[in-house]
């Protein structure tokens, strides 16, 4: 059993730094981390998973230095992470998710993957994972819904029912 989360616009609203992330101005992005916000319900969701002893891995297309800064700033309790430089191929390719499963959930029968973009859902499905489209931070809701995820949710608290169904 295991959970995989995308970072930006799934766990945290980092939209204030989006233009700097796209241009690779990481110094400016780091300065803005304190202005990011954790979506309502995320801490409850992560605490619930922790109580069930379900390991959590963040898989992101961002560099590890950035990811670690965000995790530390918001005190996310996660098991591990897979970042941009950990694989040669990136989402929507399943390589980052497959790396997470093989390294951190090698005996897992079921892994649930949460993301806000079509590339998250496509990568999850290609890796054979249970895919959950997260609408609260998504900028592409219509096409995200059209990507045929296993589940679609509007609020992080809705993820608790999915986790209970598989791991509860």
Describe each PLM feature range:
Residues 43-51, 101, 121-125:
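Surface-exposed amphipathic alpha-helices with a cationic face
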Residues 60-62:
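Conserved phosphate-coupling serine/threonine residues in phosphotransfer and NTP-handling enzymes
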Residues 77-91:
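A short, structured active-site edge motif that brings together acidic residues
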Residues 113-152:
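Acidic, Mg2+-coordinating phosphoryl-transfer loop and its flanking beta/alpha structural elements
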Residues 52-54, 103-110, 166-167:
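Glycine-rich phosphate-binding loop signature in dinucleotide/nucleotide-binding domains
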Residues 2, 94-121:
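Conserved Lys-Pro-Asp/Glu-containing loop-to-beta segment of HAD-superfamily phosphomonoesterases
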Residues 30-57, 68, 72, 94:
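Short, acidic loop-to-helix structural element flanking the phosphoryl-transfer center
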Residues 1-41:
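Active-site neighborhood of HAD-like aspartate-dependent phosphohydrolases
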């Amino acid at each position: 059993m295991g959970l995989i989360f995308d970072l930006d616009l799934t766990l945290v609203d980092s939209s204030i730094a989006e233009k700097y992330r796209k241009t690779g101005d990481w110094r400016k992005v780091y300065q803005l981390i304190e202005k990011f916000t954790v979506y309502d319900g995320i801490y409850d969701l992560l605490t619930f998973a922790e109580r069930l002893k379900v390991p959590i891995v963040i898989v992101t297309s961002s560099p590890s230095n950035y990811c670690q800064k965000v995790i530390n700033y918001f005190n996310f309790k996660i098991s591990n992470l897979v970042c941009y430089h950990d694989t040669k191929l990136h989402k929507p390719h399943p390589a980052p998710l497959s790396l997470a499963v093989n390294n951190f959930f090698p005996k897992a029968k079921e892994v649930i993957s949460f993301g806000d973009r079509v590339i998250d859902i496509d990568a999850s499905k290609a890796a054979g994972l249970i895919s959950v489209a997260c609408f609260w931070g998504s900028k592409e809701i219509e096409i995200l819904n059209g990507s045929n995820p296993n589940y679609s949710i509007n609020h992080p608290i809705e993820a608790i029912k999915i986790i209970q169904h598989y791991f509860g």
